[in-house]
Amino acid sequence: MTSYCEYLQDHPEDTLNKLYHDSEYGFPLTNDAALLERLTLEIAQAGLSWTLILKRKEAFHQAFEGFEVDSVAAYGEKDVARLLADSGIIRNRLKVNAVIENARRIQGLRGEYGSFKGWLGAHHPLSLEEWTRLFKRTFVFTGGEIVKEFLRSTGYLPDAHDPDCPVYKQIARLEPAWARDLRNTPPTERRDKASHPG
């Protein structure tokens, strides 16, 4: 299967995906609004192309008011109706409701973990299977593929970039969660951990 890095080497004209690959994909995120936004985009992509989601990324950001968790968690039926009428985003009621419910679930994590980022950090490292079970218990609309891509794209699982990709080295210098995990892993175990997240 072709990796994202290989795809972009073969398709240099795809500037939309290149921008995301070079400046966002795999980079660690540090605040709950950014994490909720990324989770939302992964949920929105289910059954659709990632390119379509990238084309609508800014519209999502505006429609959900920057993904400020408390604002989204407070959305009611009028907000749902507004979102379902917004042609700039993916107008799927299940997905829209999932964003709002997940914002409320993030609020619920604050008492014990302080934030969504704190919750992720408290459970890292886990295998992909363990992460998926945990997400399904904690959030809604979070199947295995959504969880995998969310964790890859936010620096909790490796393999967002090929090791020979220049962006891989750039991200590794930022010490995302997966890189800290590898640093603390005996060399004999690193190949499996790096090649097979989960």
Please tell me what each predicted stretch does.
Residues 1-198:
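HhH-family (HhH-GPD) DNA N-glycosylase catalytic core used in base-excision repair
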